[in-house]
Amino acid sequence: MRRRAKGAIIALVAVSAMLAIPSAQSLPGGIAGVQQAGCNCHGAVPSDTVVPSIEGLPESYNYSETYNITVSFEGGPSQEGNVNQGGFHLWASKGSLAVNDATAQLYNENEVGHTEAGNDQVSWTLTWTAPATDTNVDFILHVNSVTGNADGAGG
């Protein structure tokens, strides 16, 4: 009996650890639901040489107004001419996001990411429609700069 109890406790601790530690992953066609965990490629370690940016957001918004925004990144292993350069995931706490072309996809009104057609670039243009009421809005942007060689060395 003691051996079973010990085995059950070890299994419970292992499962709890897997659930408690957020995993980060990425796919060539994008991935939804990573606003907290972020994304990386082939288990690569996140790098502070990759600098994400969001352009086009106002300091203060007008209710229900639509803004053109550009999400992009600089740095990391991504190089012009790579088959794949990277991707992104953007989440907004309020308002609604929309895609402008086939390089990005809408997961839900608060969440958008790159598509497989859009993983050969480092910049994507989207739209964000502000909420109809006065409220604080948070944005979480994750980007993934990759080598495109699929070998796990730097993405």
Regions found by a protein language model. Name each.
Residues 2-7, 16-155:
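Sequence context surrounding c-type heme c attachment/ligation sites in exported
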